[in-house]
A protein has these predicted regions:
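Alpha-helical transmembrane segments
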Residues: 7-21, 74-76
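Short, membrane-exposed interhelical loops at transmembrane-helix boundaries
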Residues: 151-171
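Hydrophobic alpha-helical membrane-insertion segments
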Residues: 124-142
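Membrane-interface helix-boundary motifs at transmembrane edges
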Residues: 56-68, 114-120
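Membrane-helix interface and helix-disruption motif detector
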Residues: 24-40, 63-64, 82-92
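Hydrophobic alpha-helical transmembrane segments
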Residues: 164-187
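Alpha-helical transmembrane segments and their immediate interhelical/interface regions
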Residues: 46-57, 82-110
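Membrane-helix interface motif
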Residues: 25-26, 140-155
Length: 209
């Protein structure tokens, strides 16, 4: 299933990415030259891949047995990475809501929870992803308001014939943040619900044969 492949990539890339970033930041902080920074970055990636290889090789690692605190850290890590990579544009962070909903449904399905517990868990993960999205939107708004060129950049980007005022920026930030917050909640909710039902139907079909 493509969903399982995506989860394996998401969880499998954590260690290599952390190692890469640690080596890169270390080189930058000591004021190394470009060639040393590049060499350090590649070395960090290779080191991370080697570590990941031995983790997987042991065969004791299961993404569905990770602690909730670890899952939260991984989610926040990717949210920050995407926020930085896409230069503070939060729309790309919406993808993590669906991934989280899919993962949480798969994690719970084997426990066969009752309807009350299932509803509570679905709400928990949906609220969590929405809150993280809210924080991402706040960060995006903060950087937008602290950058004196934001208004001019928006005017040029969208070829506007009028000046962008602070009031407009505030309105767009509030409206956009609210839309992203609600969208993330429902994306997570829908992904969870659809995944859980599909897994149940698949299980029933398998058992009936």
């Amino acid at each position: 299933m493509i969903g399982n492949f995506i989860l394996k990539v998401v969880f499998g890339a954590v260690v290599p990415l952390l190692s890469l970033m640690a080596f890169w930041w270390s080189a930058v902080l000591i004021g190394a030259g470009d060639s040393i920074i590049l060499l350090s970055t590649v070395s960090g990636l290779i080191a991370g891949l080697v570590i990941e290889y031995f983790i997987v090789r042991k065969g004791k690692f299961s993404i569905y047995k990770l602690r909730t605190s670890t899952l939260i850290l991984i989610y926040v890590f990717y949210s920050i990475c995407f926020f930085g990579f896409f230069m503070g544009v939060p729309v790309f962070n919406l993808v993590f809501g669906s991934v989280a909903g899919y993962y949480w449904a798969r994690k719970l399905v084997n426990n066969n929870p009752d309807k009350v517990v299932l509803r509570e868990e679905k709400t928990k993960v949906s609220v969590f992803t929405a809150l993280i999205m809210g924080l991402i939107c706040l960060l995006s708004a903060y950087f937008a308001f602290t950058d004196v060129h934001t208004a001019a950049n928006l005017k040029g980007m969208f070829n506007l014939s009028f000046e962008v005022s602070n009031g407009m920026l505030i309105g767009v930030s509030i409206a956009g943040g609210a839309i992203f917050f609600v969208s993330q909640y429902f994306l997570t909710d829908v992904a969870f619900e659809k995944t859980y039902r599909n897994l149940l139907n698949l299980s029933k079909t398998t058992n009936s044969k």
